[in-house]
Amino acid sequence: YMDVIAIHRSGAAAAVAPLGTALTPEQIALLWKLHDEPILCFDGDAAGQRAQTRALERILPLLEPGRSVRLAALPQGMDPDDLIAASGPEGFRKLIGTARSLVDSLWEQTQAEFDIRQPEARAQFWQAVRGHVRSIGNNQVRSAYGDEIESRIATMRNQIRGISSM
């Protein structure tokens, strides 16, 4: 809860935390009542990355048109309180301003699990990211994510083949 207090002291309009529990579907629904695209910020350590992965797994089935999240990535080993202490409120506002879209975060986080220089690992990555798309409950959102992911895979294939994307 010290992170939330530090964020409030930095001048943020609102900040909440699940207080040591994983983000639940009920908490996600409450966040969406406050904002259609809340920004999630997890600690920049291994536990924070695991929490982010679990949160994404819980959010994907709940996505609806006009409802998503953005993710702000803290520097390695830092939590919000550390960042504010080191960089001041402006540093935290800057971090929030660079929050990534859910589809970008999903792509990057999944890709980081694989050495995509190897064809077998690249195939595993594509399989994993497509699996995430299949977990989206809403048909329209799942279709839109599928189109985006397939476009990124096609771009990656073209880069491997030495074809520049248009």
Regions picked out by a protein language model, each given a short descriptive name:
Residues 1-3:
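Short, polar loop motifs at secondary-structure junctions
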Residues 5-13, 34:
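Alpha-helix C-terminal capping segments
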Residues 13-20:
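Short hydrophobic/aromatic-enriched beta-strand-loop microsegments
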Residues 22-38, 42-166:
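A charged alpha-helical hairpin associated with nucleic-acid processing machineries
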